[in-house]
């Protein structure tokens, strides 16, 4: 989306497990020790997803490793983190994820040009097993094609 961003972590499994229909950008509420840990790149959003809690949206299962120099002021690694969105966006998201089969998945986390941590979210629909198999076959075929072209 934005050219001036320093990517902290990406969720590569999300593109394999889901059909991404729409991509959104959201701010995230963090503690100081969490930001320091993110600057070191110590985070994982592989299993993370977002969900609504009334009129707010929270990011769940996002693992941010404890910052070793924060000692007693450290954060819990998997706490729910509030996402910062406009009210219109929240209503739109809640309407979409309440439909059966849709979920809100974290795709990447990055620092923008103002050094604020942003989360890229995708409104996604889960893939069936046969969809995943078809994606693997297509990927393998593209690899084979490129090998054949290089050999000629």
From Swiss-Prot:
Key words, A-Z: Cytoplasm, RNA-binding
GO annotation terms (biological process): trans-translation
Keyword Transcription in record: no
Superkingdom of source: Bacteria
Cytoplasm recorded as keyword: yes
Described purpose of this protein according to its UniProt entry: Required for rescue of stalled ribosomes mediated by trans-translation. Binds to transfer-messenger RNA (tmRNA), required for stable association of tmRNA with ribosomes. tmRNA and SmpB together mimic tRNA shape, replacing the anticodon stem-loop with SmpB. tmRNA is encoded by the ssrA gene; the 2 termini fold to resemble tRNA(Ala) and it encodes a 'tag peptide', a short internal open reading frame. During trans-translation Ala-aminoacylated tmRNA acts like a tRNA, entering the A-site of stalled ribosomes, displacing the stalled mRNA.
Any single Gene Ontology cellular-component annotation: cytosol
Protein name: SsrA-binding protein
Coiled-coil residues: none
Molecular function terms from GO: RNA binding
Similarity field: Belongs to the SmpB family.
Gene3D superfamilies: 2.40.280.10
Listed PANTHER family: SSRA-BINDING PROTEIN (PTHR30308:SF2), TMRNA-BINDING COMPONENT OF TRANS-TRANSLATION TAGGING COMPLEX (PTHR30308)
UniProt xrefs under PROSITE patterns: SSRP
Pfam families: SmpB
Compartments it resides in: Cytoplasm
């Amino acid at each position: 989306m934005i050219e001036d961003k320093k990517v902290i972590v990406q969720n590569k499994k999300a593109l394999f497990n889901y059909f991404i229909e729409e991509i959104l950008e959201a701010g995230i509420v963090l503690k100081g020790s969490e930001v320091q840990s993110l600057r070191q790149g110590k985070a994982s959003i592989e299993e993370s997803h977002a969900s609504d809690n009334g009129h707010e949206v929270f990011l769940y299962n996002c693992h941010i490793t404890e910052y070793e120099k924060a000692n007693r002021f450290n954060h819990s690694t998997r706490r729910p983190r509030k996402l910062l969105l406009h009210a219109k966006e929240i209503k739109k998201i809640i309407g979409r994820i309440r439909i059966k089969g849709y979920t809100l998945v974290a795709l990447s986390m990055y620092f923008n040009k103002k050094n604020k941590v942003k989360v890229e979210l995708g409104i996604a629909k889960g893939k069936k097993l046969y969809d995943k198999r078809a994606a693997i076959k297509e990927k393998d075929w593209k690899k084979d094609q490129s090998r054949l072209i290089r050999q000629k």
